[in-house]
Amino acid sequence: MGIALENVNFIYQEGTPLASAALSDVSLTIEDGSYTALIGHTGSGKSTILQLLNGLLVPSQGSVRVFDTLITSTSKNKDIRQIRKQVGLVFQFAENQIFEETVLKDVAFGPQNFGVSEEDAVKTAREKLALVGIDESLFDRSPFELSGGQMRRVAIAGILAMEPSILVLDEPTAGLDPLGRKELMTLFKKLHQSGMTIVLVTHLMDDVAEYANQVYVMEKGRLVKGGKPSDVFQDVVFMEEVQLGVPKITAFCKRLADRGVSFKRLPIKIEEFKESLNG
């Protein structure tokens, strides 16, 4: 098992008049090698879970297990520091994580910070920059001279240079044009196919259907539904009640079903819809 949350509660500014409960009794598992989506509105607890997975936060109650490391309210930073190498966290606007004077130095910083030699760190940085589609001609440029999309790729390369087993993505395509979004999602798909565990926060149900093999639905700090996307999206009424909706093709087929068209199961992808027509 890759990750397990057991009865996790999290309270921001605990013990103060401003205390605010972000998570209430959340239990979930993320299997090694899976592609898991977390969905829910702003304030539902998704981003808090991501920071718990990476060890940036510790639970107020309950536990988070990442491989062999158990994180509880009493865990110290020195005991969970290694998790940040195993679990790479890409924030919503990842380009804000950039700070070095050149692209290559920025990507090499993380491995060096964990004791990798400069030579090996630079070699890894070159490999990861190539992987995310940054041309070698840009390696010695200031990252702040690049476009927003390029800066985001550099930031992601910096996370990948740490060689994480799990990649945690908080709305990674926010603000990108359709082409840039598609290219990044294709990259994450390839990383998953290579064996990496992916955890994705997104508000795009079509991306959940296309890429994820597991989805958890969060609402007001609680886990309210979970399972395979093909199962979760069958409950169109529930998904509309929580104001998240379903993939476009699923919504279309639900309207057809309401008018008498028969489906064994509502398709969640275009390919499934085509197969249902041919079947």
From Swiss-Prot:
It is an enzyme of class 7 (translocase). GO terms for molecular function: ATP binding; ATP hydrolysis activity; ATPase-coupled transmembrane transporter activity. The keyword Cell membrane applies. It is a peripheral membrane protein. InterPro entries: AAA+_ATPase, ABC_transporter-like_ATP-bd, ABC_transporter-like_CS, ABC_transpr_CbiO/EcfA_su, ECF_ABC_transporter_ATP-bd, EcfA2, P-loop_NTPase. GO terms for cellular component: ATP-binding cassette (ABC) transporter complex. ATP binds at residues 40-47. Its main location: membrane. Keywords: ATP-binding, Cell membrane, Membrane, Nucleotide-binding, Translocase, Transport. The keyword Cell membrane applies. Pfam families: ABC_tran. ATP-binding (A) component of a common energy-coupling factor (ECF) ABC-transporter complex. Unlike classic ABC transporters this ECF transporter provides the energy necessary to transport a number of different substrates. Belongs to the ABC transporter superfamily. Energy-coupling factor EcfA family. This is Energy-coupling factor transporter ATP-binding protein EcfA2. It comes from Streptococcus pneumoniae serotype 2 (strain D39 / NCTC 7466).
